[in-house]
Every structure is written in C-alpha cells, then in structure tokens.
Regions:
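Short, surface-exposed "cap/lid" segments of acyl-processing enzymes
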Residues: 164-195
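C-terminal catalytic histidine-bearing segment of alpha/beta-hydrolase fold enzymes
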Residues: 333-337, 344-380
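A fold-wide structural signal in alpha/beta-hydrolase
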Residues: 171, 196-206
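Primarily recognizes the serine-hydrolase "nucleophile elbow" in alpha/beta-hydrolase
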Residues: 227-291, 304
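Catalytic nucleophile-loop/oxyanion-hole region of alpha/beta-hydrolase
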Residues: 183-192, 203-242
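N-terminal cap/lid segment of alpha/beta-hydrolase-fold proteins
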Residues: 111-166
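Short, polar/acidic, helix-capping and beta-turn segments at strand->helix junctions
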Residues: 1-101
Length: 380
C-alpha cells in the first residue's frame, strides 16, 4: 500500500478546482504505475466541505469526468485556516499480478486496456471536455428547451428542443457516451445542431450512471425513455412517426441495443426506431469483461453476450449508419466492423471518418459530411 498526494489546484470555481486536483492525482497514479481501480481510499482536506459535496450532481459529474465510476471510500477532513481550499491524497493498493498471455484477439491485458482507453489515446482530452461543456451550455442557452422526466430516477430525464415554426416535427434522439459511467446530456446538445436546423425536434437523453445501476439497467432506462416519447408524443408536440436515433461511444452501444429491441413485444410499433447513426460504439462486450471496469457494470461473460448487439438479431425495421474515427484504436474500428458484418450494413453506410478521434467525431456529426450522411440516412 502506498499513499499519493497531497495534490492541490488553484481555481476560483470549486468544480474546476476539484477537476484539476483529481487530474493531478490521475497523473500521479499513472506515474506510479497504477490506475483508478487501485485506489482503496481518498482523503479530501478542505476549508469548505459544502463546496465539494459529491451529493451535488455537478460535483459528482466533475469527479466522474476524471475517474468515471471508480470511487473508493472518501473521508472529508477540515483543513487548517490559511491552507489550500482543497487538497487530496489517496491510498493505493499494490497491483495484482497480470494474467499471462493473450485475452482477446491476441491482446494481452496491458495492450487491451490501451486499446479500450480513448482517453489514453488522446493526451489533451481535458480541453476537449471543456469544449463539450461550454458549447453544450451555449447551445442550450440559445435554443428554447425544457427538461422532462421519463422515469422516477434522478437522471431519468431528457431535454426536449423543438424547431421553430414546425408543427409536430419528427424526432431525433441522442444518447451521450462516457463509458456508461460519466458525462451528461447538457454536454452534448450542440452535436444535434444539424438535425434541429433541418426541422427535427431533438430529445437529449440522460440515464443512470454505473455503478449506481448495472449496464442492463441502463439499457432498460433507454427503452423506457423511447417508449415514453412515443406514448407522450402528442403532449410533447412531436410527430408519432418512427424516430431517428443516434448515440456516441457507450451511447452508441445503448442506441444499438434500442435498435435491436423487439418493440412489438413491449406494445410499441416494431419500427419505433426508423433510422439510426451509431458513432464509435461498443457492440461486442466480451473484451470489456477482462478490464477493471467490468465489476462497475456488473459485466461477466454471460451478461456480456446478451448485452452485445452483435449477438442480437439483425434489425429489419431500422436503417443503420455506422461511423468511427480514423484516429481511433484498432479495437474501436474493429467494434464497428463487427456490427457492420453482423447486421449486414452496406459499405456505403459504414464509414471511417478521417482525422477524427474518439472525442472529435461528434463534431463531424454536428456539421460536416457525417452530418449530411446522417440526415440523408434519416430521410423518409
């Protein structure tokens, strides 16, 4: 057992102060050859505990942006007067011996972890996330919208944006990523720009984040949200026509699971999802069972199989467009290729987007050739 820290940050805003301090701790973990899953405890020493309360959703999201769902027990202690407003230290376990040999497609564990770590492939990711937050807030600030509850949970919410001057528009639904453990609908509203400007209504979905719910629970929430939107369409001012659905990263997985759903068995139209764009998603989950995140998702080999879209029947009622960034890892490209093969997606609707990584491909979806392709795919 070792102790890392204390780490501090100086910023006027407590959320950004926490985010920067946690990122310093993340770098210290990396330097020590450890990861977030090795942390056994944290101590936050602060002069203002109320400012860093993880019960505050904004603080919770800032934590998750750095460490996702990995959260050891956290002790809060008062700092002496005159010290930094926040300092953080962590106790870290000795790494367990690594399994020997290949685990998936010839990859050993360290290589597999790198392949499935988009953050590790994009060193300067913090400015990208800041761009997400700022652009999302600006987009929502510039467009009338309302938050609607589709379920009882605190994150079972959606933001609904309606185009001006169009009665009962068709609906475009977007599901954000974050490895099922992080991010928020408000960080992603800007990526629906092309659809809103084309006259679609837009629903931005939030959902519970692991480990507060396992992955199958998140799939159920997305299905519930889509059913809610169909049943409430007249009251919400949207058309009862097949939806267009999009999802990025973990949201791509959740969107694919929705596409593969037997909607008729749930008392809904079989073509509830008419068209879908799946961006840099995860469609074969077996390799994730070897990674430290698996327990957070309650994912084992059995659940990974039936939660993998590649093992579900090919949807006949939905026209699917697949895209992945040209700068993404071989495994993320392979994930998209697997679904294209399993679902017999035509070559013209399976795209590798040049010069885009896992986090910037959504910019291309907001405006650019990928946006035009998604709109063409969604056209009746």
């Amino acid at each position: 057992m070792i102790e890392l820290g204390p780490v501090t940050a100086m910023h006027d805003h407590p959320v950004e102060e926490l985010r920067q301090a946690l990122d310093h701790l993340r770098l210290a973990l990396m330097s020590a050859g450890r990861g977030p899953h090795h942390m056994t405890g944290m101590v936050w020493t602060t002069t203002a505990p109320a400012l860093f309360d993880l019960a505050n959703p904004t603080i919770d999201l800032a934590y998750r942006e750095v460490f996702a769902g990995f959260r050891p027990p956290i002790e809060i202690e008062m700092a002496p007067a005159g010290g930094p407003r926040l300092s953080i230290r962590a106790t870290v376990a000795r790494p367990a011996p690594l399994p020997v040999g290949p685990l998936w497609r010839g990859y050993d564990l360290p290589t597999l972890m790198r392949e499935y770590s988009p953050r590790g492939q994009v060193p300067a990711v913090a400015p990208i996330f800041e761009h997400y937050r700022e652009e999302g807030a600006a987009f929502l600030g510039a467009h009338a919208h309302r938050e609607v509850a589709y379920g009882a949970g605190p994150r079972e919410r959606l933001d609904l944006l309606l185009p001006s001057g169009i009665a009962e528009p068709r609906l475009h639904v977007f599901i954000h990523g974050g490895y099922w453990q992080a991010m928020d609908k408000g960080n992603h509203a800007q990526f629906t720009r092309a659809f809103l400007e084309a006259g679609y209504a837009v629903a931005m979905l939030n959902y519970s984040l692991a480990p507060e719910k396992p992955l199958d629970g998140l799939v159920a929430e997305i299905r519930a949200a889509l059913g809610f939107l169909w049943h409430q369409a007249p009251a919400l001012g949207i058309a009862r026509l097949p939806f267009d659905l999009a999802g990025h990263s973990a949201g791509g997985h959740l969107a694919a699971m929705a596409v593969a759903t037997d909607w008729a068995a749930l008392g809904l139209p079989p073509d509830l999802i008419g068209t879908a764009t799946l961006l840099s998603g995860l469609y074969e989950l077996e390799p994730l069972t070897h990674l430290p995140m698996a327990p957070l998702l309650a994912l084992d080999r059995i659940s990974a199989h039936w939660l993998s879209p590649v093992h579900l029947p090919r949807p006949s009622a939905t026209r699917v467009l697949l895209a992945v960034g040209g700068l993404e890892s071989d495994e993320f490209k392979h994930q998209t290729a697997l679904l294209a093969e399993a679902w017999n997606v035509p070559v013209g609707r399976h795209r590798i987007v040049p010069d885009r990584n896992h986090f910037t491909i959504v910019d291309e979806f907001a405006e650019g050739p990928l946006a035009l392709a998604a709109l063409a795919n969604a056209a009746p």
